[in-house]
A protein has these predicted regions:
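Residues immediately C-terminal
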Residues: 57-58, 85-86, 512-513
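Short conserved segment of the HATPase_c
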Residues: 86-109
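GHKL-family ATPase ATP-binding module
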Residues: 2-15, 25, 49, 57-59, ...
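C-terminal interaction appendages of subunits in large macromolecular complexes
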Residues: 392-411, 426-431, 442, 446-448, ...
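Conserved short strand/loop->alpha-helix "switch" segment adjacent to the catalytic nucleotide/phosphoryl-transfer site
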Residues: 30-49
Length: 649
């Protein structure tokens, strides 16, 4: 997806010869993935985000306080705001009403004009015109100057020219957009309420004082919520820490402007061992971090070390040099910056590159956090004690950590897990199977393609990293084996470029124990190597549940429906030859040839790629299911038990 770019409307090259390039929506319909990422569920939801981003831009400019989103019975969407309303006057050079330009021209909008919007949200920035292009129908009502103006469109083409359809009070302004996604474009036309709710909640936290309501009118799913966070990021941190035990009641909060950059920071420590830091730029979730996050982390480390130096703590602890990992253990933090012209980079264009932002955030941390700690010594001492405790654990883990650092490819020969490596060395071509059990590991080793497939058998269940400190995590032999085999390190030592395999495949039994082992592995990867998930390197193998055979015919089924369909297709037990059905309870029940054919052969296997669409929600779920607190886990199970379709008892 392309990042928002600024168009200079006064530039000499923006003339008639450029109109076709800038205005053609046909390119959007031909290659929608370039504009919204995909035509699956992700892209479908992105249409809503794009329209809501326009309303949020009005809020950022101080002109909107209420936004409503409605999912109608036919999965069409309405978004309403109380902003100024999209301009309806005729554009001086284009000869079209402003609203028609916004709806039919890529990159046409006030957000590209510094005088209209100082900052604007939305990652790709192509505007609501893309929503128009990818909708079978779109209608827009603009409340402005005491009148209600109306237009409608069909697949990006204007059907009804701008006209006045009603009157309102002079101070009643805003925009209403209704659209129905095009079934010729999207493979899935069903909106997920929870997906939209998570984003609306996030936007409410990031834009304090703006109320965002979400209503579902679909039969049997009727629901409505309003998200409003007057405390902004403070409330977001409280939400994130709801399933943890905070070490101090008050959320540390900074909200200021430095060199024309808006900086909002909120954080709170809990008694856990994981670091949960979320960063945003102009409401965009910067999954890959960037200069703002670097400024926050370095500033936090420096300030806490400075405070340690002037504190009244004992001399031995006072001499400790706290690392970034030490001061961020148990930290839940949210950082949001507002930048006029953000420069994005990285694999998914979600990494901030503006160098000036790092200095601004560091300066703010140095000045305001130092002042806060001096004014709140009780909170400061809690943070210091937590960091010192982490430092001691880090020192205890140092030797174990050193064992995990892969110096060369020769190191794998000493792996306690007996890695069967592949002969190719190009990480792009290589795959690593993490296999449950020695028995299945043996079958996988014999059945694999030795050129590009490596096998690492795992003995038993690894440690639950959600409940353990880093020294305990690294004392676990299986964990050390996995880290060394992958070769990229963990946490601050992690380097994606050093990863030895670009496909890391979790292959476990299709039973409760297998699911538990898979969950433990995913917890470890999410907490210690999240970059692997973000890069799309983590996959789940899908071994079959059944072997269905009749005579010389042999097929494999991955669920009960597929099994029953196969039995019916094979004629069932026709009296001459009976159908033989084998239920696989473990990978070890398959011989090497069967394991290759069903689960490992790139031409016939099915792999599920692990991705994190909502990092906040993923963090909450891992805390709930894998953390110490039993009550939230019980509530989660009670609420979701009805959705379980495959239960081993």
């Amino acid at each position: 997806m392309a990042v928002k770019e600024k168009i200079d409307r006064t530039a000499s090259h923006y003339d008639a010869e450029n109109i076709q390039v800038l205005k053609g929506l046909e390119a959007v319909r031909k290659r929608p993935g370039m504009y919204i990422g995909s035509t699956s569920a992700s892209g479908l939801h992105h249409l809503v985000y794009e329209v809501v981003d326009n309303s949020i831009d009005e809020a950022l400019a101080g002109h909107a306080t209420e936004i409503s989103v409605t999912i109608h019975k036919d999965d069409s969407i309405t978004v309403v705001d109380d902003g100024r309303g999209i301009p309806v006057d005729i554009h001086p050079t284009e000869g079209l009403p402003g609203v028609e330009l916004a709806m039919t021209v890529l990159h046409a909008g006030g957000k590209f004009d510094k005088n209209s919007y100082k900052v604007s949200g939305g990652l790709h920035g192509v505007g609501v015109s893309v929503v128009n292009a990818l909708s079978s129908q779109l209608k827009v009502w603009v409340r402005r100057d005491g009148k209600v103006h109306y237009m409608d469109f069909n697949r990006g083409t204007t059907i009804t020219q701008l006209k006045v359809v009603g009157t309102v009070a002079k101070n009643d302004t805003g925009t209403k957009v209704w659209f129905k996604p095009d079934d010729l474009i999207f493979t899935d036309l069903t909106y997920k309420y929870d997906t939209l709710a998570n984003r609306m909640r996030e936007l409410a936290y990031l834009n304090k004082g703006v109320g965002i309501s979400l209503t579902d009118e679909r039969e049997g799913q009727e629901k409505s919520e309003t998200f409003l966070a007057r405390g902004g990021l403070q409330e977001m941190v409280q939400f994130l820490n709801a399933r943890s035990k905070p070490l101090h009641a008050e959320v540390v909060y900074i909200d200021t402007t430095h060199d024309d950059i808006g900086i909002e920071i909120a954080f709170q420590y809990n008694d856990g061992y994981n670091e949960n830091v979320f960063s945003f730029v102009n409401n965009i979730n910067t999954h890959e971090g960037g200069t703002h996050l670097t400024g926050f982390k370095s500033g936090l480390t420096r300030v806490i070390n400075q405070y340690l130096g002037r504190s009244s703590i004992n001399k031995k602890d006072k001499e400790a040099k706290l690392s970034g990992d030490d001061v961020r253990e148990g930290l839940t933090a949210v950082l949001s910056v507002k930048v006029h012209e953000p420069q994005f980079e990285g694999q998914t264009k979600t990494k901030l590159g503006n160098s000036e932002v790092e200095g601004a955030v560091t300066s703010v941390m140095n000045e305001l956090l130092n002042r806060y700690l001096d004014e709140h010594p009780k909170v400061a001492n809690i943070i210091i004690e937590k960091a010192i405790s982490a430092s001691r654990a880090r020192e205890a883990a140092r030797k174990a950590r050193d064992l995990t650092r892969k110096k060369s490819a020769l190191d794998v020969g000493n792996l306690p897990g007996k890695l069967a490596d592949c002969s190719l060395s190009d990480p792009v071509l290589c795959e690593l199977y993490l296999v449950e059990g020695d028995s299945a590991g043996g079958s996988a080793k014999m059945g694999r393609n030795r050129n590009f497939q490596a096998i690492l058998p795992l003995r038993g269940k690894i440690i639950n990293v959600e409940k353990a400190r880093i020294d305990k995590v690294l004392s676990n032999e299986e964990i050390r084996t996995i880290i060394t085999a992958i070769g990229a390190g963990i946490r601050d030592d992690f380097s994606l470029e050093s990863t030895r395999y670009h496909k890391i495949i979790l292959m476990v039994d299709a039973d409760v124990d297998g699911a538990h082992i898979r969950t433990l592995l995913l917890t470890f990867l999410f907490r210690q190597m999240p970059e692997l998930i973000e890069a799309g390197y983590i996959y789940l193998a899908q071994p079959p549940l059944y072997r269905v055979a009749k005579g010389k015919e042999e097929y494999y089924a991955y669920d009960e429906k597929e099994r029953d369909d196969l039995i019916a297709r094979m004629g069932g037990n026709d009296g001459r030859t009976s159908v033989n059905i084998q239920r696989y309870k473990g990978l070890g029940e398959m011989n090497p040839d069967q394991l290759w054919k069903t689960t490992m052969d790139p031409n016939t296997r099915t792999l599920l790629k692990v991705n994190v669409e909502d990092a906040v929600l993923a963090d909450q779920i891992f805390q709930t299911l894998m953390g110490d607190d039993v009550e939230p886990r019980r509530q989660f199970i009670e609420a979701n038990a009805k959705f379980v379709s495959n239960l081993d008892v």
